[in-house]
Protein backbone atom coordinates (compact mmCIF):
# COMPACT_ATOMS: atom_id res chain seq x y z
CA UNK A 1 0.00 0.00 0.00
CA UNK A 2 1.29 3.47 -0.88
CA UNK A 3 1.02 6.00 1.94
CA UNK A 4 1.77 9.73 1.76
CA UNK A 5 2.73 11.11 5.17
CA UNK A 6 3.10 14.70 6.32
CA UNK A 7 4.99 15.36 9.55
CA UNK A 8 7.15 12.28 9.02
CA UNK A 9 10.17 13.77 10.80
CA UNK A 10 8.12 14.67 13.88
CA UNK A 11 7.73 12.63 17.05
CA UNK A 12 4.59 10.70 16.12
CA UNK A 13 5.27 10.79 12.38
CA UNK A 14 8.72 9.25 12.64
CA UNK A 15 7.49 6.40 14.85
CA UNK A 16 4.55 5.81 12.53
CA UNK A 17 6.74 5.86 9.41
CA UNK A 18 9.01 3.23 10.95
CA UNK A 19 6.04 0.99 11.77
CA UNK A 20 4.44 1.32 8.34
CA UNK A 21 7.69 0.80 6.42
CA UNK A 22 8.47 -2.21 8.60
CA UNK A 23 5.11 -3.70 7.62
CA UNK A 24 6.08 -3.49 3.95
CA UNK A 25 4.13 -0.40 2.94
CA UNK A 26 5.54 2.16 0.52
CA UNK A 27 5.81 5.31 2.61
CA UNK A 28 6.36 8.68 1.00
CA UNK A 29 7.15 11.48 3.43
CA UNK A 30 6.78 15.21 2.94
CA UNK A 31 9.77 16.96 4.52
CA UNK A 32 10.81 20.57 4.83
CA UNK A 33 14.18 21.71 3.44
CA UNK A 34 15.58 22.04 6.98
CA UNK A 35 14.36 18.63 8.21
CA UNK A 36 16.73 15.85 9.23
CA UNK A 37 15.71 13.16 6.75
CA UNK A 38 18.45 10.63 7.53
CA UNK A 39 16.31 8.50 9.92
CA UNK A 40 13.64 8.18 7.22
CA UNK A 41 16.12 7.36 4.48
CA UNK A 42 17.63 4.63 6.64
CA UNK A 43 14.17 3.04 6.67
CA UNK A 44 13.99 3.17 2.88
CA UNK A 45 11.36 5.89 2.92
CA UNK A 46 11.19 8.23 -0.06
CA UNK A 47 11.20 11.90 0.91
CA UNK A 48 9.68 14.80 -0.99
CA UNK A 49 10.75 18.32 -0.12
CA UNK A 50 7.86 20.70 0.35
CA UNK A 51 5.50 22.30 2.82
CA UNK A 52 1.83 21.84 3.68
CA UNK A 53 1.44 25.58 3.10
CA UNK A 54 2.37 24.98 -0.56
CA UNK A 55 -0.14 22.60 -2.12
CA UNK A 56 1.80 22.22 -5.37
CA UNK A 57 4.86 20.95 -3.49
CA UNK A 58 2.88 17.90 -2.31
CA UNK A 59 1.48 16.78 -5.65
CA UNK A 60 4.35 14.52 -6.74
CA UNK A 61 4.57 12.66 -3.44
CA UNK A 62 0.82 12.31 -3.00
CA UNK A 63 0.02 11.15 -6.53
CA UNK A 64 -1.08 7.53 -6.58
CA UNK A 65 -1.40 7.25 -2.79
CA UNK A 66 -3.89 4.83 -1.27
CA UNK A 67 -3.80 6.68 2.06
CA UNK A 68 -2.81 10.19 3.08
CA UNK A 69 -1.84 10.59 6.74
CA UNK A 70 -1.66 14.22 7.81
CA UNK A 71 0.49 14.46 10.94
CA UNK A 72 2.23 17.79 10.34
CA UNK A 73 1.57 20.67 12.72
CA UNK A 74 3.21 23.79 14.09
CA UNK A 75 3.35 23.58 17.91
CA UNK A 76 5.69 26.52 18.54
CA UNK A 77 3.75 28.98 20.70
CA UNK A 78 6.71 31.36 20.66
CA UNK A 79 6.73 31.71 16.87
CA UNK A 80 4.77 34.13 14.68
CA UNK A 81 1.01 33.52 15.06
CA UNK A 82 0.45 33.73 11.31
CA UNK A 83 2.93 30.90 10.73
CA UNK A 84 0.93 28.64 13.04
CA UNK A 85 -2.34 29.55 11.34
CA UNK A 86 -0.81 28.92 7.94
CA UNK A 87 0.49 25.48 8.94
CA UNK A 88 -2.37 24.20 11.06
CA UNK A 89 -5.37 25.69 9.28
CA UNK A 90 -4.42 26.49 5.69
CA UNK A 91 -1.98 23.57 5.61
CA UNK A 92 -4.66 21.10 6.71
CA UNK A 93 -7.03 22.44 4.07
CA UNK A 94 -4.30 22.15 1.43
CA UNK A 95 -3.52 18.52 2.26
CA UNK A 96 -7.19 17.48 2.29
CA UNK A 97 -8.12 19.41 -0.85
CA UNK A 98 -5.23 17.92 -2.82
CA UNK A 99 -6.10 14.42 -1.59
CA UNK A 100 -9.66 14.96 -2.79
CA UNK A 101 -8.60 16.29 -6.19
CA UNK A 102 -6.12 13.45 -6.73
CA UNK A 103 -8.74 10.85 -5.86
CA UNK A 104 -6.91 9.44 -2.83
CA UNK A 105 -8.89 6.56 -1.34
CA UNK A 106 -8.57 7.29 2.38
CA UNK A 107 -7.40 10.19 4.55
CA UNK A 108 -6.31 10.08 8.20
CA UNK A 109 -5.88 13.25 10.21
CA UNK A 110 -3.61 13.03 13.25
CA UNK A 111 -5.19 15.77 15.31
CA UNK A 112 -4.84 16.35 19.07
CA UNK A 113 -6.90 16.73 22.22
CA UNK A 114 -6.07 20.42 21.72
CA UNK A 115 -8.93 20.33 19.20
CA UNK A 116 -11.38 20.19 22.14
CA UNK A 117 -9.84 23.12 24.06
CA UNK A 118 -9.84 21.08 27.27
CA UNK A 119 -12.32 18.84 29.07
CA UNK A 120 -15.29 19.66 31.37
CA UNK A 121 -14.60 21.90 34.33
CA UNK A 122 -15.90 19.27 36.78
CA UNK A 123 -12.96 17.00 35.91
CA UNK A 124 -15.01 14.40 34.07
CA UNK A 125 -13.54 12.87 30.93
CA UNK A 126 -14.72 14.08 27.53
CA UNK A 127 -15.41 11.76 24.61
CA UNK A 128 -15.09 12.15 20.85
CA UNK A 129 -18.39 14.02 20.97
CA UNK A 130 -16.88 16.71 23.17
CA UNK A 131 -17.92 19.08 24.53
CA UNK A 132 -15.57 21.64 23.01
CA UNK A 133 -14.34 24.16 25.60
CA UNK A 134 -14.34 27.72 24.30
CA UNK A 135 -12.73 30.19 24.25
CA UNK A 136 -9.68 28.17 23.33
CA UNK A 137 -6.79 28.46 25.80
CA UNK A 138 -4.03 28.73 23.19
CA UNK A 139 -3.54 29.65 19.56
CA UNK A 140 -2.41 26.07 18.95
CA UNK A 141 -5.72 24.76 20.28
CA UNK A 142 -7.71 27.23 18.18
CA UNK A 143 -5.80 26.41 15.00
CA UNK A 144 -6.05 22.65 15.52
CA UNK A 145 -9.81 23.04 15.86
CA UNK A 146 -10.10 25.22 12.77
CA UNK A 147 -7.83 22.89 10.81
CA UNK A 148 -10.05 19.90 11.60
CA UNK A 149 -13.14 21.80 10.53
CA UNK A 150 -11.43 22.63 7.24
CA UNK A 151 -10.68 18.93 6.66
CA UNK A 152 -14.30 18.00 7.40
CA UNK A 153 -15.48 20.28 4.62
CA UNK A 154 -13.74 17.94 2.19
CA UNK A 155 -15.43 14.96 3.81
CA UNK A 156 -18.76 16.55 2.84
CA UNK A 157 -17.57 16.44 -0.77
CA UNK A 158 -16.70 12.75 -0.59
CA UNK A 159 -13.19 12.44 0.86
CA UNK A 160 -13.15 9.41 3.17
CA UNK A 161 -11.72 10.77 6.40
CA UNK A 162 -10.82 9.39 9.81
CA UNK A 163 -9.36 11.35 12.72
CA UNK A 164 -7.35 10.41 15.79
CA UNK A 165 -6.90 12.68 18.81
CA UNK A 166 -3.78 11.77 20.82
CA UNK A 167 -3.44 13.22 24.31
CA UNK A 168 -0.06 14.09 25.87
CA UNK A 169 2.27 11.63 24.15
CA UNK A 170 5.36 10.29 25.91
CA UNK A 171 7.90 7.51 25.63
CA UNK A 172 11.23 6.85 23.92
CA UNK A 173 12.82 7.89 21.68
CA UNK A 174 13.02 11.67 21.66
CA UNK A 175 14.17 13.25 24.89
CA UNK A 176 12.76 16.67 24.01
CA UNK A 177 9.85 15.61 21.81
CA UNK A 178 6.19 15.14 22.61
CA UNK A 179 5.62 15.45 26.33
CA UNK A 180 9.00 13.92 27.15
CA UNK A 181 10.33 17.45 27.61
CA UNK A 182 7.87 17.99 30.47
CA UNK A 183 8.81 14.71 32.15
CA UNK A 184 12.51 15.42 31.68
CA UNK A 185 12.09 18.85 33.26
CA UNK A 186 10.54 17.32 36.38
CA UNK A 187 13.21 14.60 36.55
CA UNK A 188 15.94 17.24 36.47
CA UNK A 189 14.24 19.47 39.04
CA UNK A 190 13.73 22.36 36.66
CA UNK A 191 10.31 23.30 38.02
CA UNK A 192 10.62 24.88 41.48
CA UNK A 193 6.86 25.41 41.71
CA UNK A 194 3.87 23.32 40.71
CA UNK A 195 0.96 25.08 39.01
CA UNK A 196 -2.36 23.43 38.23
CA UNK A 197 -1.46 20.53 40.54
CA UNK A 198 -5.01 19.16 40.74
CA UNK A 199 -5.86 19.52 37.07
CA UNK A 200 -6.44 16.21 35.30
CA UNK A 201 -4.59 15.25 32.12
CA UNK A 202 -4.51 12.17 29.87
CA UNK A 203 -1.14 10.60 29.04
CA UNK A 204 -0.61 8.08 26.23
CA UNK A 205 2.48 6.04 25.32
CA UNK A 206 3.91 6.68 21.83
CA UNK A 207 3.70 3.02 20.77
CA UNK A 208 -0.01 2.96 21.62
CA UNK A 209 -0.61 6.02 19.45
CA UNK A 210 1.08 4.30 16.52
CA UNK A 211 -0.86 1.08 17.14
CA UNK A 212 -4.08 3.08 17.31
CA UNK A 213 -3.40 4.73 13.96
CA UNK A 214 -2.61 1.38 12.33
CA UNK A 215 -5.83 -0.10 13.69
CA UNK A 216 -7.86 2.83 12.40
CA UNK A 217 -6.41 2.17 8.95
CA UNK A 218 -7.24 -1.52 9.21
CA UNK A 219 -10.64 -1.46 10.91
CA UNK A 220 -12.35 1.92 11.12
CA UNK A 221 -15.20 2.92 8.82
CA UNK A 222 -14.80 6.29 7.08
CA UNK A 223 -15.99 9.26 9.10
CA UNK A 224 -15.12 7.84 12.51
CA UNK A 225 -12.89 9.66 15.01
CA UNK A 226 -10.96 8.11 17.90
CA UNK A 227 -9.39 9.50 21.05
CA UNK A 228 -6.02 7.91 21.84
CA UNK A 229 -5.99 9.15 25.40
CA UNK A 230 -4.41 6.73 27.88
CA UNK A 231 -4.49 7.19 31.65
CA UNK A 232 -5.95 10.24 33.38
CA UNK A 233 -3.97 11.62 36.33
CA UNK A 234 -3.53 14.90 38.15
CA UNK A 235 -0.24 16.71 37.73
CA UNK A 236 0.42 16.16 41.44
CA UNK A 237 0.03 12.38 41.01
CA UNK A 238 2.31 12.39 37.97
CA UNK A 239 5.06 14.23 39.84
CA UNK A 240 4.80 11.82 42.78
CA UNK A 241 5.23 8.86 40.41
CA UNK A 242 8.26 10.48 38.80
CA UNK A 243 9.74 11.04 42.24
CA UNK A 244 9.29 7.38 43.17
CA UNK A 245 10.67 6.08 39.87
CA UNK A 246 13.53 8.42 39.19
CA UNK A 247 14.22 10.28 42.41
CA UNK A 248 12.96 13.46 40.80
CA UNK A 249 13.04 16.26 43.38
CA UNK A 250 9.41 17.36 43.78
CA UNK A 251 8.68 21.07 43.35
CA UNK A 252 9.07 22.92 46.64
CA UNK A 253 5.95 25.03 46.18
CA UNK A 254 2.42 24.62 44.90
CA UNK A 255 1.17 27.98 43.67
CA UNK A 256 -2.26 29.15 42.48
CA UNK A 257 -2.21 29.94 38.79
CA UNK A 258 -3.73 33.36 39.45
CA UNK A 259 -0.80 34.25 41.70
CA UNK A 260 1.72 33.16 39.06
CA UNK A 261 -0.11 35.14 36.41
CA UNK A 262 -0.04 38.27 38.58
CA UNK A 263 3.64 37.78 39.35
CA UNK A 264 4.56 37.51 35.68
CA UNK A 265 3.21 41.00 35.07
CA UNK A 266 6.15 42.28 37.11
CA UNK A 267 8.65 39.53 36.31
CA UNK A 268 8.34 39.45 32.51
CA UNK A 269 10.18 42.79 31.97
CA UNK A 270 13.05 41.50 34.14
CA UNK A 271 13.31 38.26 32.18
CA UNK A 272 13.23 40.22 28.93
CA UNK A 273 15.94 42.61 30.11
CA UNK A 274 18.18 39.64 30.92
CA UNK A 275 17.45 37.90 27.63
CA UNK A 276 15.77 34.96 29.36
CA UNK A 277 12.44 33.22 28.90
CA UNK A 278 10.01 33.30 31.83
CA UNK A 279 9.13 29.90 33.34
CA UNK A 280 5.52 30.18 32.15
CA UNK A 281 3.89 31.93 29.22
CA UNK A 282 0.36 33.31 29.39
CA UNK A 283 -0.87 30.56 27.06
CA UNK A 284 0.78 27.85 29.16
CA UNK A 285 -1.05 29.18 32.20
CA UNK A 286 -4.29 29.18 30.22
CA UNK A 287 -3.78 25.46 29.53
CA UNK A 288 -2.85 24.71 33.13
CA UNK A 289 -6.14 26.23 34.27
CA UNK A 290 -8.06 23.53 32.40
CA UNK A 291 -8.57 19.81 32.71
CA UNK A 292 -7.43 17.66 29.77
CA UNK A 293 -9.13 14.39 30.70
CA UNK A 294 -10.40 12.18 27.88
CA UNK A 295 -12.09 8.79 27.54
CA UNK A 296 -10.75 6.40 24.88
CA UNK A 297 -13.40 3.69 25.34
CA UNK A 298 -14.31 3.89 21.64
CA UNK A 299 -10.78 2.97 20.52
CA UNK A 300 -10.60 0.14 23.04
CA UNK A 301 -13.95 -1.38 22.10
CA UNK A 302 -14.18 -0.74 18.35
CA UNK A 303 -10.51 -1.19 17.47
CA UNK A 304 -9.50 -3.61 20.22
CA UNK A 305 -6.74 -1.19 21.21
CA UNK A 306 -4.89 -1.92 24.42
CA UNK A 307 -3.56 1.30 25.93
CA UNK A 308 -0.96 0.89 28.65
CA UNK A 309 -1.20 2.90 31.86
CA UNK A 310 1.51 5.05 33.40
CA UNK A 311 2.65 2.24 35.70
CA UNK A 312 3.70 0.37 32.56
CA UNK A 313 4.75 3.25 30.34
CA UNK A 314 6.61 5.52 32.77
CA UNK A 315 9.41 3.14 33.94
CA UNK A 316 11.03 2.68 30.49
CA UNK A 317 10.49 6.36 29.76
CA UNK A 318 12.16 7.49 32.97
CA UNK A 319 15.05 5.10 32.36
CA UNK A 320 15.47 6.49 28.85
CA UNK A 321 15.26 10.14 29.92
CA UNK A 322 17.69 9.73 32.80
CA UNK A 323 20.23 8.18 30.42
CA UNK A 324 20.06 11.08 27.94
Question: Would you name each region that the model predicts?
Answer:
Residues 3-23:
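N-terminal Rossmann NAD(P)H-binding glycine-rich loop of SDR-like oxidoreductase domains
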Residues 34-41, 45-90, 98:
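NAD(P)H-binding glycine-rich loop region in Rossmannoid oxidoreductase-like domains
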Residues 83-89, 126, 136-148, 168, ...:
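Short-chain dehydrogenase/reductase
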Residues 90-139:
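Conserved Rossmann-fold NAD(P)-dependent oxidoreductase catalytic core, especially the SDR/UDP-sugar
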Residues 111, 148-172:
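Conserved beta-loop-beta element that borders a ligand/cofactor-binding pocket
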Residues 131-135, 184-204, 208, 212:
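A conserved pocket-lining segment of Rossmann-fold NAD(P)-dependent short-chain dehydrogenase/reductase
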Residues 212-279, 301, 309-311, 315-324:
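Mid/C-terminal beta-alpha module of Rossmann-like enzyme folds, strongest
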Amino acid sequence: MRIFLTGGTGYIGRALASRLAGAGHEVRALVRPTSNTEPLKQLGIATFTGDVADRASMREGMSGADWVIHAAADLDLTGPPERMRQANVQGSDNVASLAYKLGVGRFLSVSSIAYFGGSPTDGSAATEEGPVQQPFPTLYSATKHSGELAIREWAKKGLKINTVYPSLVYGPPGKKEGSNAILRGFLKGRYPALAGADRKTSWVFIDDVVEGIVRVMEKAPPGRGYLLAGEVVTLRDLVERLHRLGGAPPPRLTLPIGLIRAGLVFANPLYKARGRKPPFSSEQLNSLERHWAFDDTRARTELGLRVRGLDEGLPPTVEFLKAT
